[in-house]
Regions:
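Alpha-helical transmembrane segments of multi-pass membrane proteins
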Residues: 10-14, 112-120
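Loop-to-helix entry and N-terminal half of a specific, functionally important transmembrane alpha helix
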Residues: 104-114
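Cytosolic juxtamembrane regulatory segments of multi-pass membrane proteins
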Residues: 44-45, 141-151
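Long, highly hydrophobic alpha-helical transmembrane signal-anchor segments
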Residues: 1-24, 81-105
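Individual transmembrane alpha-helix segments
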Residues: 59-81
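Juxtamembrane/interfacial segments flanking transmembrane helices
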Residues: 31-32, 118-143
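Small-residue-rich helix-interface/hinge motifs
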Residues: 5-64
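Transmembrane helix-loop junctions in multipass membrane proteins, especially transporters and channels
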Residues: 26-30, 96-100, 124-128
Length: 151
């Protein structure tokens, strides 16, 4: 089960999170690029690149927003966690209505999604100096400085 969680569920949760940033950045007219994983790039699919250690993390980079306002940047930074939360609620609803089985896989998916929400909204910079979503929100509200790329 560990391998399923680490090599399948966690990358899917990461993809959902990054897709939230991507969708909202596109809604504001931004050009985007996003990545799943770290290390050497394996391949690209449009703006998505998959890296060697695809199960480790993800990031999103955007520029040229049509609406280059503080609220637009905050919306983009919050969108990853919002997508994770929407999926948590959807999965729980589908389990409660017996559409999905009460499976450990779905519980792990919800767990990893909560993990992503918690740590992405906590304000910090990682070892590479990239800001968490929470730090990016803090910086854009306090200093008017949009961060790029974001985790």
């Amino acid at each position: 089960m560990f391998f399923v969680n680490f090599f399948i569920i966690l990358p899917v949760v990461t993809f959902v999170h990054e897709a939230g940033h991507v969708l909202v950045a596109r809604l504001f007219g931004g050009r985007i690029k996003f990545s799943i994983g770290t290390g050497k790039k394996i391949f690209d699919i449009g703006p998505l690149e998959i890296r060697k250690r695809y199960f480790m993390e993800g990031w999103c980079q955007y520029d040229k927003l049509s609406y280059n306002k503080t609220w637009a940047h905050v919306s983009i930074y919050l969108a990853g966690s919002l997508f994770n939360l929407i999926l948590i609620l959807l999965i729980n609803y589908l389990i409660l209505t017996d559409v999905l089985p009460k499976s450990l896989i779905f519980r792990q998916f919800v767990y990893f999604s909560f993990y992503f929400i918690f740590f992405s909204l906590m304000p910090y910079k990682n070892d590479d100096g990239k800001p968490s979503d929470g730090m990016a929100i803090y910086d854009v509200i306090r200093y008017g400085k949009a961060e790029d790329p974001i985790d």
